[in-house]
Amino acid sequence: MSPTVFHLIGPPGSGKRTVGLHLAALTGAVLLDNHLFRDAVYRPYGADGLRPIPPELQALGTQVWALGLQAARMAPGDVSQIFTAHHAGDAAGAAAAEQIRAVAVDRQARYVPVWLQCEVEELARRVALPERCDRAKLRDPAQLRQVLEARGMLEPHAGALMIDTGATPPVEAAQRIAACITS
């Protein structure tokens, strides 16, 4: 059986990592959430999710992320992967999303794009939750609104699975995603 590359796309606070953890438990896929890579440089800097990440540090995070994608391409054929990301609605966001799809193509893996959506007020509530302190995740509701207003979200691909995580519990969302590879 060929591997699967799941691509969970959504704004900060939409539950990408939480859904990804449930999906990993259901499928055995490796969870490669965006903070796994970027926190390698964000944490030494002291990023706390409240103060903005300077452009120089974002560039370092992008370099580490690129190395992670390179390693993902080298995975054995029996390894499926779950990537999580917030892709902005601009050329950079589209290019980043394409890089993850390219991993699937290079690995001859099935590509399953999933858009996680949630109302902004619920996202704002979630980003302030204390469990987001474990990683250098955005934790400021005002910054969240600014990011979403300034850069938006990448438009969903045709045929992508759409899940409202404000109305769908994480385990149910993961079950819906896992069902894509059995149908």
Question: Where are each of the predicted segments found?
Answer:
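P-loop (Walker A) phosphate-binding loop of NTP-binding proteins
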Residues: P11
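Glycine-rich phosphate-binding loop used to anchor ATP phosphates in small-molecule kinases
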Residues: L60-W115
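Conserved substrate/cofactor phosphate-moiety recognition/catalytic segment
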Residues: L21-Q70
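Conserved phosphate-donor/acceptor-positioning beta-strand/loop module used by diverse small-molecule
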Residues: V105-A128, I163
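Conserved Walker
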Residues: T18
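Hydrophobic anchor at the beta1->P-loop junction of P-loop NTPases
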Residues: L8
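Small-molecule kinase domains that catalyze NTP-dependent phosphoryl transfer to phosphate-bearing small molecules
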Residues: R125, L129-R176
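Conserved glycine(s) of the Walker
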Residues: G15
